[in-house]
Amino acid sequence: MPTARQQSGQRAEELAAEFLRAAGCEILYRNYRRRLGELDIVARADGELVVAEVRMRTSNAWGGAAASIDRRKQQRITRAANQLLQQRPDLAAMPVRFDVLVVSDPYGPSPSIEWIRHAFEAC
C-alpha cells in the first residue's frame, strides 16, 4: 500500500500529465524507469522531446519545489533520458528539453501547476 506521500506524488504526476495533454503535448511515457534513473513524464511537443520532472511541495522553504532538483538529480534525469534515446532512435533526432512542473495542493479544490520550460540543461 502506497504511503500518503507516494499517493500525493502519484496524484501530482496525474495532474501534470493531464496539464501537458491539455497544452497539446503527446505523452509518450510516464514513470520511465531504468537502472540509471527515472523520468516522470516524457512527451512530444512542437517537434521537441520534453522530459518533465514533476515536483510537489506544500512550502517554499529551502527554495521551493523547483530548487529541489539539484545537480545530482539533473544528472540522473539526463542519464535516463540518454538511455531512452539509445533505445528509441526515432526520438534521438529531436531536440530535448528538460522541464519542471510544480504542482501545488494536488488534492485541493483548485490545484495549481507552474510549468518551468527549459528548467535545466543536460549534464
What positions do the PLM features span?
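Conserved catalytic cores of phosphodiester-cleaving nucleases, focusing on short active-site segments
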Residues: 39-64, 69, 77
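Hydrophobic "anchor" residues on beta-strands that sit immediately upstream
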Residues: 26, 49, 95
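Acidic-basic catalytic patches of nuclease active cores, encompassing PD-(D/E)XK
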Residues: 1-30
